Design a protein with these regions (language model features):
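Core catalytic region of metal-dependent phosphoesterases/phosphodiesterases
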Residues: 2-97
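Active-site environment of divalent metal-dependent phosphoester hydrolases
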Residues: 10-15, 37-42, 61-67, 104, ...
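Active-site-proximal segments of metal-dependent phosphoesterases and phosphodiesterases across multiple
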Residues: 72-79, 108-137
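Haloarchaeal acidic low-complexity proteome signature biased toward cell-envelope/secretome components but also
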Residues: 1-3, 10, 16, 210-221
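Acidic, His/Gly-rich catalytic cores of divalent-metal-dependent hydrolytic chemistry
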Residues: 154-221
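Conserved hydrophobic/aromatic beta-strand scaffold that supports enzyme active sites
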Residues: 102, 112, 178-180
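Beta-strand-turn-beta hairpins that frame and shape the catalytic cleft
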Residues: 1-4, 105-111, 155-159, 184-187
Length: 221
């Protein structure tokens, strides 16, 4: 089975649509969390992900959209959640509430979780990936997100992968990121694709979100 992995869409519809158009043939798509937050298309992204993804796990922004004050100390995150709460329908909010923290795919051989497998909200940066192997001893692999940094490691027929962020990369590469996992060969390909960032910047200004939400996309920070 070939699985398209998307993560950290964060309300960036132009990036999401470009990724879906660029993605090679896959059997299914899995979303590794944080459909909303930051960028100005939360409702459209929820609907698109609901339509294309067979499995979606809950990210921290998905989990806290009803309580934006959780991120009051982070202006961009707080503003994005407040905006999302206004824009999303009750049905969409209920769907985000209902998402599981973890899931399995590929005949239950691959674990999907937004952040750390056991410690909610913990960032697992590339240099920390080796610490994850003990959590996936009974699996062929693990896909996680949260850091917005694309990375993979393969060892002994098992794979760890962060597909990177569709909607807000933070690895100094402005291109939208995603990955394709092959569960038969236990291998993963990382992908990047350019999209219309100016469209996001203009929409951010139009709806009154902090300007930096848009301009940070230019340098992948």
């Amino acid at each position: 089975m070939r699985i398209g992995l998307i993560s950290d869409v964060h309300g960036n519809l132009p990036a999401l649509e470009t990724v879906l158009s660029d993605m090679p043939d896959v059997d299914t798509i899995v979303c590794v969390g944080d459909v909303i937050g930051y960028n100005p298309w939360p409702a459209a992204c929820v609907e698109r992900v609901r339509d294309v993804a067979s499995v979606t796990v809950q990210g921290n922004h998905d989990r806290t959209v009803r309580t934006p004050e959780t991120y009051r100390g982070n202006q961009m995150a707080y503003a994005g959640l407040e905006y999302a709460l206004e824009e999303l329908s009750e049905d969409q909010l209920t769907w985000l509430d209902s998402l599981p923290r973890k899931a399995t795919v590929g005949d239950d051989r691959f674990m999907i979780v937004h952040d750390h497998p056991e410690i909610q909200d913990r960032y697992v940066m590339p240099h920390m990936f080796s610490s994850l192997w003990s959590y996936v001893e009974e699996y062929d692999g693990l896909a996680l997100g949260h850091t917005h940094v694309q990375h993979k490691e393969v060892d002994g027929g098992r794979v760890l992968v962060n597909p990177g962020s569709v909607g807000q990369p933070r690895d100094e590469d402005q291109r939208a990121a995603y990955a394709v996992l092959d569960t038969e060969t236990v291998s993963v390909d990382l992908h990047r694709v350019n999209y219309d960032i100016d469209r996001v910047i203009n929409k951010v200004e139009e709806v009154g979100l902090p300007k930096r939400v848009g301009t940070r996309l230019l340098d992948g920070s």
